[in-house]
Every structure is written in structure tokens, then in C-alpha cells.
């Protein structure tokens, strides 16, 4: 711990994403997933590159001021292939997936979607508004 207070410590800025889910604001650092990854009408919102051992945000960086969003709907064969390729981030580009990098976005789900935030919080939502707060905090490593 003393190293973190010394000259060898590195301080890096990290973006915070604020998700407004049906009007309730929930900040997150890493990711938000609506539905099953690569399932029917899924959405992956990435502020970091990885979810577990899957490289779902191959261009995403927690300090670039952008949110990486992948949306789409894959059949079971394409889903298996995309899941396999996501270990190396080579699932993109894909003709059935839309990928974009934005500062803010609003998505609507009908019916409400199951949402998982940073791998922990689970809830349902119909309207999802996202915005990034660049350099919201600093991490010392």
C-alpha cells in the first residue's frame, strides 16, 4: 500500500457512464448488457474492453470519453460463432451487429429488457439513456 502513495504510483483518469433507466440514474464504470450477449435484440454498452473472458469492446477504453455500443440479433449458429470469436475481439465487424462509439445515447425496449450492470446489478427497464462523464475520477495503481 505504501507504493500507492509514493513516486512509483501511477494515477489514471477513468470515465463514468451514467445510465438513466426509466428515470432512475445508475452510474457504472465497466459495462451494461441488455438481454443475452449475442441473443435476440441484445445491447452491450462498454466503457471497458472485457466482460469476464470476452473481449466485447475491442476498441473500448475507460478513459477515452466515449461509450462503445454493440446491438443486434443473431440466430443460434451465428451466436455460437460470435461467442467463440468474442474471446479475441474478432466478432466485429459482423453484418448482423451494429457498433458505434458515442458520448450519449437513448434506447427503448418493448417489452422492458433485462439489464445487467457491471456484472452485479440486475433489473428491468424500458427506456435507457446513457451519457459519459469523462475523467470523472482517478485510480491509483
Describe these PLM feature segments.
Residues 1-58, 63:
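Catalytic core of DAGKc-family lipid kinases
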Residues 67:
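Glycine-rich phosphate/diphosphate-binding loops and the adjacent beta-loop-alpha structural elements
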Residues 71-141:
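ATP/nucleoside-binding phosphotransfer catalytic cores, i.e., glycine-rich phosphate-binding loops
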Amino acid at each position: 500500500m505504501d507504493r500507492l502513495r509514493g513516486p512509483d504510483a501511477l494515477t489514471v483518469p477513468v470515465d463514468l457512464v451514467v445510465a438513466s433507466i426509466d428515470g432512475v440514474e445508475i452510474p457504472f464504470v465497466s459495462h451494461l448488457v441488455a438481454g443475452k450477449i449475442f441473443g435476440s435484440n441484445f445491447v452491450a454498452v462498454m466503457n471497458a474492453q472485457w466482460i469476464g473472458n470476452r473481449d466485447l469492446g475491442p476498441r473500448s477504453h475507460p478513459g477515452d470519453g466515449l461509450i462503445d455500443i454493440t446491438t443486434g440479433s443473431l440466430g443460434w449458429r451465428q451466436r455460437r460463432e460470435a461467442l467463440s470469436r468474442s474471446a479475441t475481439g474478432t466478432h466485429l465487424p459482423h453484418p448482423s451487429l451494429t457498433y458505434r462509439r458515442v458520448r450519449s445515447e437513448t434506447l427503448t425496449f418493448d417489452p422492458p429488457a433485462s439489464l445487467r450492470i457491471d456484472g452485479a446489478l440486475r433489473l428491468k427497464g424500458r427506456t435507457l439513456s446513457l451519457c459519459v462523464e469523462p475523467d470523472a475520477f482517478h485510480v491509483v495503481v
